[in-house]
UniProtKB/Swiss-Prot annotation:
It comes from Schizosaccharomyces pombe (strain 972 / ATCC 24843). This is Tyrosine-protein phosphatase CDC14 homolog. Its main location: nucleus. The keyword Cell division applies. The keyword Transcription does not apply. The gene is clp1. Residues 526-537 have a biased composition (Basic residues). GO terms for biological process: division septum assembly; DNA damage response; meiotic cell cycle; microtubule cytoskeleton organization; mitotic cytokinesis checkpoint signaling; negative regulation of G2/M transition of mitotic cell cycle; positive regulation of cytokinesis; positive regulation of exit from mitosis. Belongs to the protein-tyrosine phosphatase family. Non-receptor class CDC14 subfamily. Interacts with ark1 at the kinetochores. Interacts with bir1, cdc25, mid1, nbl1, pic1, and rad24. Phosphorylated by cds1, chk1, pmk1, and cdc2 upon Hydroxylurea and H(2)O(2) stress treatment. Phosphorylation regulates the nucleolar-to-nucleoplasmic transition. Is able to autodephosphorylate. Keywords: Cell cycle, Cell division, Cytoplasm, Cytoskeleton, Hydrolase, Meiosis, Mitosis, Nucleus, Phosphoprotein, Protein phosphatase, Septation. Residues 400-411, 490-502 have a biased composition (Low complexity). One of its GO terms (molecular function) is phosphoprotein phosphatase activity. Residues 370-382, 421-437, 514-523 have a biased composition (Polar residues).
């Protein structure tokens, strides 16, 4: 349904054909709009300003607003009439902001809307809604918005520190008055209140026999509601023994009026708060219970419940109007990250303590190197285990073998086959003559491969054919009368062919024993098959 052209100005829709908001320069005439029910709170729910502040409206106003809306809905339901409910306000920017804020907060706390949906209808309003200022006398340089109020209440509800069903409107409106103590609940943990004044009291004089009525009301209420700690932030205006005599602890944490506390004082306040038992209540006051009180309570709510600075300022002002004044707003905004960091710092410290408690420190052994298998034998006398095969070792004077020369499983099998084939060849061909091979030069020691146990070795020998074929006889045996180098070859003792040159002698000296390939029984050596004349490991 479009009401834009009905002379009602801009109609902001929250629920189609059910709930709307608009601002009008004059009250509408009901007979012109029979399908709508108009109501306003401008003259019914009134904000009581300190100076130039005008809102937001407090939590008792919110509850009363919900009662009004539900009363209208119930009336139409009983009459079986379907009318759109329209909240309207004056075009005054302050009244307009209060009405729109109250409706959005109602949608979140009562109708359980998520904050972004409650704010969406107000986002395109023209002109935009005015921000809320502090209660100070100076020129305002810091504002909170309807969005801050909505998210502040939402976060308080999500953190279980606000349940409007548990708020007694009568008590709220009674005790917020100066003559009745001037205090408000901020959360189930905190009460903010103005300093009690004990007329005629000072440090040197005796305690007055009778307390002023506001002080007596505060004292009785605190005892009945499990207040365990009083934190005084201003200079003394009463005797602290008044609280101590009824079992309430009293703590002085003074700093100047209108200023902000040191971060060390904030940490002390947080630590002090967490020392109070879970169901114990802490009452905090300065002179008026607004500025300095709001600093410390706001810092704790940011620390504990993840409020942003704007959210916590807005929330506290809804619970107790006027809280946090002037530069204290900027202080909360600047230091909000430090409050959260302190939370994680303490959480980490607790986690470390729990881990340490779970694994208590043990006395170290008298001999740290003793075996840990339950015996008293020292590791010094315990034999070392066998070295793992294949561990790298350095040998002086030799270069380490290249990676391609390391034995693999296939090369080990090949070497074993070669060994068996050589033995079989010696037995079957022991009558063949070895006449024309050169001195069977054996490669350097680094080409020797060791497999199996350390006592069993297999020597892999490279055999080369002669580059000259002129000395090969028809039967395939090379003539023993000459060497491939051209030097005369002679038969030496020990069944070795050697040349007369010094090179041949040195080669013979370098060669390893070929007992695995020789059979000296007949003075002959086995001749390998030509296809296996070059073996590469």
């Amino acid at each position: 349904m479009d009401y834009q052209d009905d002379g009602l100005g801009e109609m902001i829709e929250f629920l189609e054909d059910k709930l709307y908001y608009t601002s009008l320069s004059q009250p509408p005439k009901a007979e012109l709009y029979p399908h709508m029910h108009f109501f306003t709170i401008d003259d019914e729910l009134i904000y009581n300003p300190f100076y130039h502040d005008f809102g937001p409206l407090n939590v008792s106003h919110l509850i009363r607003f919900a009662v009004i809306v539900h009363g209208i809905m119930g009336k139409h339901r009983q009459a079986k009439k379907s009318k759109a409910i329209v909240l309207y306000s004056s075009t005054d920017t302050r009244l307009r902001a209060n009405a729109a804020c109250l409706l959005a907060c109602y949608m979140v706390l009562v109708q359980n809307w998520p904050p972004h949906l409650a704010l969406a209808p107000l986002a395109q309003a023209e002109p935009p809604f005015l921000g809320f200022r502090d209660a100070g006398y100076a020129v305002s340089d810091y504002y909170i918005t309807i969005q801050d109020c909505v998210y502040g209440l939402w976060r308080a509800r999500e953190s279980s520190i606000l349940n409007i069903r548990n708020i007694d409107v009568h008590d709220y409106e009674t005790y917020e008055r100066v003559e009745n103590g001037d205090f408000n609940w901020i959360s189930p943990k905190f009460i903010a209140f103005a300093s009690p004044i004990q007329a005629g009291w000072n440090h040197a004089s005796t305690r007055p026999k009778k307390l002023p009525q506001p002080f007596a009301i505060v004292l009785d209420y605190f005892v009945a509601n499990k207040v365990k700690l009083i934190v005084r932030l201003n200079g003394p205006l009463y005797d602290k023994k008044t609280f101590e005599n009824v079992g309430i602890r009293h703590k002085e944490m003074y700093f100047e009026d209108g200023t902000v506390p040191e971060l060390s004082l904030v940490k002390e306040f947080i630590d002090l708060t967490e020392e109070v038992e879970e169901d114990g209540v802490i009452a905090v006051h300065c002179k008026a219970g607004l500025g300095r009180t709001g600093c410390l309570i706001g810092a704790y709510l940011i620390y504990k419940h993840c409020f942003t600075a704007n959210e916590v300022i807005a929330y506290m002002r809804i619970m107790r109007p006027g809280m946090v004044v002037g530069p204290q707003q900027h202080w909360l905004h600047i230091n909000q990250v430090h409050f959260r960091a302190y939370f994680y710092e303490k959480a980490m410290g607790r986690a470390i303590q729990q881990a340490t408690a779970a694994e208590p420190l043990a006395t170290p052994p008298r001999h740290p190197l003793n075996a840990t298998n339950g015996t008293s034998q020292s590791n010094i006398s315990t034999p070392l285990p066998e070295p793992t095969p294949g561990q790298p070792r350095k040998v002086s004077g030799h270069n380490p073998p290249s990676a391609r020369r390391l034995p693999s499983a296939s090369s080990v099998k090949f070497n074993e086959k070669l060994k068996n084939a050589s033995k079989q060849s010696i037995q079957n061909e022991n009558k063949a003559s070895y006449s024309s091979y050169e001195d069977s030069e054996i490669q350097n020691d680094d080409e020797t491969r060791t497999v199996g146990t350390p006592t069993e070795t297999i020597s892999v020998v490279r055999l080369r054919r002669s580059s000259s074929q002129s000395n090969i006889e028809p039967n395939g045996v090379r003539s023993p009368t000459s060497s491939p180098t051209g030097s005369p070859i002679r038969r030496t003792s020990g069944n070795r062919w050697s040349s007369g040159s010094s090179h041949s002698k040195k080669s013979a000296q370098r060669s390893v024993s070929m007992s695995s390939l020789n059979n000296t029984s007949n003075g002959r050596v086995a001749k390998p098959k030509p296809s296996k004349s070059r073996l590469i490991s």
